[in-house]
Regions:
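Carbohydrate-active catalytic/glycan-binding domains of CAZyme proteins
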Residues: 18-150
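Sec-dependent N-terminal signal peptides
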Residues: 4-13
Length: 150
């Protein structure tokens, strides 16, 4: 009986020596304003879009392989041009921003839906084959707060 207790005690004592060790991890805080993130994984990369409060360029697209090291690879739009107030003519929407973008991937294409805080209260849906490339306006759906693509 003594041998069994000694063997069990040794086994329990040594079990921690073979446990997986925790690696060193640094908090991936970056010098950026990234509110309302929407993130997906496609292949070996994670992609993230977020709100921009001063519109242009707008809706940054970021990419990471490990969720720690991020790079901004593009913007969904460089300018919004369908209303004069986006160019500070006939009023302004400066500081109202576009918010809560929704990022999705389907059948080889990336999609982003967001709504700016302006009238006539219409959203924007953009699409791209390459998220680091040029994004194309696909649709102007009705405005929805924090909308999400399925």
């Amino acid at each position: 009986m003594k041998k069994i207790i000694i063997i069990i005690t040794c086994f329990i004592g040594l079990s921690g020596a073979f446990a997986q060790q925790r690696g060193m991890f640094h908090n991936p805080v970056i010098e950026a304003d990234v509110p309302d993130p929407s993130m997906i994984r496609v292949g070996n990369y994670y992609y993230l879009v977020s709100t921009t409060m001063h519109l242009m360029p707008g809706c940054p697209v970021m990419r990471s392989k490990d969720l720690v090291h991020w790079e901004t690879i593009s913007y969904v739009f460089q300018r919004l041009t369908d209303l004069p107030r986006y160019d500070l003519k006939e009023g302004t929407v400066y500081g109202r921003g576009q918010w809560a973008s929704s990022l999705r991937y389907h059948d080889g294409r990336f999609y982003v839906w967001f709504s700016p805080n302006d009238e006539p209260h219409r959203g924007y849906i953009y699409t791209a084959e390459d998220p680091a490339g040029e994004w194309t306006l696909l649709s102007r759906p009705p405005h929805h707060h924090d909308a999400s693509l399925f």
